Amino acid sequence: MAIGALVVCLSGPRLWAGQAKPLAVLEGKLLSTRGDCPLLQIGGREQTLSANTPYLYQTLQDKRLDGREVRLEGLPQPDGSFQVHWLYTVHNGKLFKVRYYCPVCNIVALGPGNCVCCQQPTELQELPADKPQS
């Protein structure tokens, strides 16, 4: 019994089954106050944003981040939007992770809103991306 093999040669980077697409990077100013759709201002143009999780989309809509310089890592979508997978704020060229924290209950949350325990609003925190978080 003969076993055949199909060989396909592709130019460019090779991706194996199960390997994620390389993420694209966009940097600009986050505009989160214009309706429901967050935008990234890059130079003179505006890029519509989506996200791969609901909490990340809610973070992009957080008015406390409006006007902040950000670095977004994600994938361009067929509809022209940019699907964000990772969000960082940028201060003096350094990257910061965004998280939400309740100082009353000592609880960390992924997205904005009230604490799941005491129902008080969570605080926005920006933590250096190059340091381990506790």
What feature does the model see in each segment?
Residues 19-36:
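Structural detector for short beta-strands of small beta-barrel domains
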Residues 118-129:
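Short Cys/His-rich micro-motifs in 6-15 aa windows
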Residues 25-30, 67-76:
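OB-fold and OB-like beta-barrel modules that bind single-stranded nucleic acids
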Residues 35-52:
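OB-fold (S1/OB) nucleic-acid-binding surfaces
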Residues 55-72:
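Short nucleic-acid-contacting surface segments enriched for D/E, G, S/T with interspersed K/R
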Residues 1-3:
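N-terminal export leaders
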Residues 75-97:
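OB-fold/S1-family single-stranded nucleic acid-binding modules
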Residues 103-104, 115-117:
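Short, cysteine/histidine-rich loop/knuckle motifs that typically chelate Zn2+
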